[in-house]
Each structure stands twice: as structure tokens, then as C-alpha cells.
Amino acid sequence: MTTADAETGRPRITRVACRPSGSRYLVFAPDDASPWYRDLLASPQATLEIDGVPHAARAVPLEGDERGFVLHLLEVDAARGRAIADQLLVHHGELRKTLAAARAELDGGPVADRSGLRRELLGHCVTFCNDLRMHHLREDGAFTAIRKAHPGLAPALERLRREHETVSRALLDLDALLQGRGDLGAVREKFERVAAGLEEHFAYEEANLLPALRGSGVPAAPVTPSG
């Protein structure tokens, strides 16, 4: 199970014992100090991997004296699809703003005069990487439910999952450049490649998922936005 760390927002992956209960799962915490238990009290969204398949889940505290949660797996109907589409655009907008803030640091003045540039960029990168990792982990879980509701989206969803892995590796490379003492020109070049790849990823996702989630149809074949 993956939860968002209640203090840092970073993804926390924990192996937990779940008990099926109809279409739901029950998970019990040994004590109040269990990190994942505190995470779910702060934010009830989780990604539950069952037999290698990720599922988006919403955690509801158990009633009575039992310490744990009922995990409701995501199901996509018309109303939920529209809500997912709206939230997707909100998340993409937030991530684009963080990218813009990092680019502003790069464009803020001559590199030679900006001794704090690397530190500032690293701060933006850490924030962005944590947010993006959490976004993609939750998407991977949601994709399972979206594919069940919209089988025609299967090719696009598989491509998006592969791109999540590519983006993760590219961000690790960028982080390594920022942590080191290499040329900041190389940092800018890598940053622009990452930013361009992410924008292409966001645009492809929006072009292929939003029509189906909003009930306006599924493309006959995956759409690759031009431009």
C-alpha cells in the first residue's frame, strides 16, 4: 500500500495484511504509531497493489474500538469520471506552476551572479518530484478502474504507465545533476528536456482521457497532440 507521508507528502510504501470484505478490503494497524495509519488519518487516498495490479482506494476508519480502515476501491461511473477529469486538470495545473517556478530560477539572472541558484532549483525539484511521484502513483491505481470502465483506453493507459517510469528516471538524473557540482548549463539542458517531456505527457493524457471521462467519447486510436 502506498500512502502520502503525513509530514512530508512523500510516497510511503508499506506491506500490509488486507482482508477482503465483498468488494472492499479491511486493513488493521497494530498501534496508533503505525506511520501508514497516521498517513491515512491525514489523507485517505491510497494505492493498493493486489497481485501486482495497482488500485486506487479511499480509506474510511473502522467504527468501534478496532484500529484500521475499510479500503474502498475506485469505481468509475459517469459522475466519478467527470470528477477525475476535473481533478486531473487541477493537478496538471499545479505541476505546471511548479515547473514554471523552477524555470524562473534558471532565468532569473546570470549564473555567475547567482550562487544560490542550485540550492533554489533543488528545492523546487524536491517539491516537484514528490508531488509528481505521488500524482503518478495515484494515477497508476486509478488507471485500473478507468480501463475497466473504458476498455478502449487500454493502449493509451499502457503508454501513460510506461511514460511514468521514463519520467521517474529523468527526474532522478536531474536530481543527480543538482546534487553534484557539474556545469549549470547541463542542468538547464536536462531541465528543458524533462519539462518538454512532461508537457508532452500531460498533453497526451488530457487529449486521450478527458473525452472519455467527460462522456464525450473515446478516440478510435490514441491521440498524439500536435505542436
What are these regions (language model features)?
Residues G22-R24, D31-V76:
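Short, structured beta-strand-loop surface elements
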Residues T2-D5, R15, T47, R138, ...:
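Generic hydrophobic/packing signal
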Residues T8-R10, S34, T47, E66, ...:
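A broad, structure-centric signal for solvent-exposed, well-ordered loop/edge residues
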Residues G9-R10, F28-A29, Y37-L40, H135:
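Short histidine-centered beta-strand/loop micro-motifs
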Residues P30-D31, P44-A46, R161-E163, G227:
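Short, charged/polar low-complexity linear motifs in solvent-exposed/disordered segments
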Residues M1-P30, H124:
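Short beta-strand segments
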Residues F69-G227:
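Small-residue-biased structural context
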